[in-house]
């Protein structure tokens, strides 16, 4: 066993994950073909569209309107983030709820857990419109509680 505790043998004690290495290579080729600048610009345009739509939802609190990513972190006043995520899931809308592995930041900002939308090049304006439609449900809080 001692001989396998040093490099490079440390990483070669089992069958290499060849399929994932090949898949990772193909994923990089795919992203390069599209172009990372093009993806980033689409992501930011989509985020601007989403913010414009989402900020009109009643009782919504958006924490990062001006960040340079496709991530939108938000809460609905008086709604527990995890409950909102479960509610949205009923409409096939996926968000992440919790502290997003950033508990210290959450504590510094003095906020509770949040919901997070993570937009990328495979998302569409129609999906954002659907999210806003569901968030604008006048009975949302009653249906969650």
What does each of the following model-derived ranges do?
Residues 1-145:
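Pyridoxal 5′-phosphate
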């Amino acid at each position: 066993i001692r001989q396998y505790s040093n490099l490079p043998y440390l990483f070669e004690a089992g069958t290499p994950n060849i399929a994932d290495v090949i898949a990772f290579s193909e994923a990089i080729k795919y992203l390069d073909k599209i172009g990372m600048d093009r993806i980033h610009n689409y992501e930011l345009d989509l985020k601007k569209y989403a913010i414009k739509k989402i900020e009109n939802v009643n009782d919504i609190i958006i924490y990062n309107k001006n960040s340079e990513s496709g991530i939108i972190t938000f809460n609905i006043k008086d709604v527990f983030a995890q409950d909102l995520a479960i509610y949205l899931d009923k409409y096939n809308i996926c968000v992440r709820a919790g502290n997003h592995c950033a508990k210290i930041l959450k504590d510094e900002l003095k906020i509770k857990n949040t919901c997070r939308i993570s937009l990328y090049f495979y998302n569409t304006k129609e999906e954002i419109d659907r999210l806003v439609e569901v968030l604008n449900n006048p009975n949302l809080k009653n249906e969650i509680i």
